[in-house]
Swiss-Prot record:
UniProt GO molecular function: cyclin-dependent protein serine/threonine kinase regulator activity; protein kinase binding
Subunit composition and interactions: Forms a cyclin-CDK complex with PHO85.
Modified residues (Phosphoserine): S32
UniProt keyword Nucleus present: yes
Note: Present with 396 molecules/cell in log phase SD medium.
Cell compartments where the protein resides: Cytoplasm; Nucleus
GO biological process, one term: glycogen metabolic process
Region: Disordered, residue numbers: 1-32, 143-163, 223-252
Name this polypeptide is given: PHO85 cyclin-8
Primary location group: cytoplasm
Length: 492
């Protein structure tokens, strides 16, 4: 059966071959430039085709269908490709590949043996010098608390959204602030359009409210012409009528070059009859006040031994100490009327703390307020230790070196929130590398940026700027002062 089919198949192939040759005979003359005979006498076509690696994969399904039919048409025409061009292209690709390989080869970046040994020695020396820090860092990360170190903080709360977390602002009233930006110019010479300086043009509004009368006399000094009339009772609304229209323009007020003195001009409203105080007397008074404040700090701190080491407290423990300190000072303040011995002999002027009094009651207690700050800002223990130290510095002292703790100033409940704001913000700026932005911290505190600046200035003036030097020894003494405060409250 197979023998019968083979002759038939050969006959069919011969017939198809003859028909195809007759079909191409008519076009041989026209296609002489495209077709020529090779050594074997077969027709060869020069076609512009390119061979690729993946060409065999193209149209695989069509090739499978055409393969059986190709045998019916006899031997296929051989196509000769331009081998020379192929070789050139292949050589070019080979050269490009070698170039890229040399560029990417890691062997080109290998260091010499001496350089490698030197680098290894440097790494070993670094690890030997810092192995203690590496181990302590690992122990903190792997501790059971599951919290990162205090300085790795975030602007967003990572804890649950409870009642305290969901409130972005609350009623810490700052309605006493004026909306006019000109009233808060700290540069007294910022407004040069007026030839006669007035209280409002000098921009003393912010500092008038931030500082007490005694503090203003320390910081300011100014000379105003006696012919210039200033309405001190109504300067916030009628400052345009404060000068005498009959005063000659050539006799306008003379402003001293206050850069030559140790203190700045004080508001004319505070000067009696517009005359500046004697600078020598003012300097002596400032020195006496500074010595008095330094003695208060010394009586409070020098009672204890100086240990140059920061107390090892967790964030929650330091926060608890800060909260307890506020509660003890509030309790001592309530007992002043019953026991006069609670207040120190050299007590502070209550007017220094007027700016911390809130106009409206807050919607959160000071305890919840502290928790809110920690949930939103996640401060470390050192911040609350610093805030505790500043709080003790302002409100606590002693009459004698070995005497009991007494109040230097009375703390009221309507002052607690703003005192907390001031102590935490200043302690953060003094002790932390990571400080939240002014916009974010104001949202957490629930106050405006102006009021925050005002509270910071007021608090720093209350410590006379001498208590802002915080050391490890002072932070360590805060815990001893807290223990003595508990004893003072128990004795009363």
């Amino acid at each position: 059966m197979a023998n019968d089919q083979d002759p038939n198949k050969s006959l069919i192939n011969d017939a198809l071959t003859r028909s195809m040759s007759e079909f191409y005979d008519d076009d041989d003359d026209n296609d002489s430039d495209m077709c020529r005979a090779n050594d074997e006498g077969e027709d060869v076509f020069d076609l512009p085709l390119k061979v690729g690696v993946s060409q065999s994969r193209n149209f695989s399904e069509v090739n499978d269908v055409l393969d059986p039919l190709s045998s019916l048409h006899g031997p296929s025409k051989k196509v000769r490709f331009e081998q020379q061009k192929q070789q050139q292209q292949h050589q070019q690709l080979h050269n490009d590949f070698n170039t890229d390989f040399n560029l990417k080869s890691p062997s080109s970046k290998k260091m010499g043996v001496e350089q490698l040994i030197q680098s290894a020695n440097e790494i070993n020396d670094y690890l030997a010098n810092n192995i203690d820090k590496v181990n302590s860092f690992n122990s903190e990360l792997l501790s059971g608390s599951g919290k990162l170190p205090g300085r790795v903080k975030s602007d967003t709360a990572t804890q649950g959204t409870g009642r305290l977390d969901s409130m972005s602002n609350f009623a810490l009233s700052d309605t006493e602030l004026d909306n006019d930006d000109d009233n808060y110019l700290l540069d007294p010479l910022a407004n040069a359009s007026s030839t006669t300086p007035t209280v409002e043009h000098h921009g003393y509004s912010l500092l008038d409210k931030a500082l007490s009368t005694s503090d203003k006399e320390k910081i300011y000094t100014n000379k105003v012409n006696s012919n210039s009339q200033i309405d001190t009772d109504n300067h916030s609304h009628e400052s345009g009528n404060t000068t005498n229209n009959e005063t000659d323009e050539n006799e306008s007020s003379e402003i001293l070059d206050y850069t030559k003195f140790d203190s700045f001009p004080y508001p004319p409203s505070s000067a009696p009859n517009g005359e500046p105080p004697d600078l020598k007397v003012l300097s002596i008074e400032c020195e006496q006040e500074n010595e008095k404040e330094l003695r208060r700090i010394s009586l409070l701190l020098d009672h204890y031994e100086s240990i140059p080491k920061i107390p090892e407290l967790s964030d929650d423990e330091a926060l608890s100490k800060f909260r307890e300190n506020i509660e003890l000072i509030l309790q001592l303040s309530k007992k002043i009327n019953d026991n006069a011995n609670t207040l120190a002999i050299s007590s502070e002027d209550p007017q220094k703390f007027v700016n911390f009094v809130m106009k409206n009651p807050p919607s959160l207690s000071f305890r919840d307020f502290i928790d809110r700050i920690q949930n939103k800002c996640m401060f470390g223990a050192v911040v609350y230790l610093g805030a505790t130290y500043l709080l003790q510095l302002v409100f606590l002292t002693r009459d004698e070196m070995d005497g009991p703790i007494k109040l230097k100033a009375k703390l009221q409940e309507d002052q607690a929130h703003r005192i907390i704001i001031s102590t935490i913000r200043i302690a953060t700026k003094l002790l932390e590398d990571f400080v939240h932005s002014q916009n974010y911290i104001c949202k957490v505190f629930g106050i405006s940026k102006r009021l925050l600046t005002k509270l910071e200035i007021s608090f720093m003036a209350s410590v006379n700027f001498d208590g802002l030097m915080i050391t490890c020894e002072k932070l360590e003494k805060t815990l001893h002062i807290l223990d003595d405060t508990r004893q003072a409250l128990g004795n009363t």
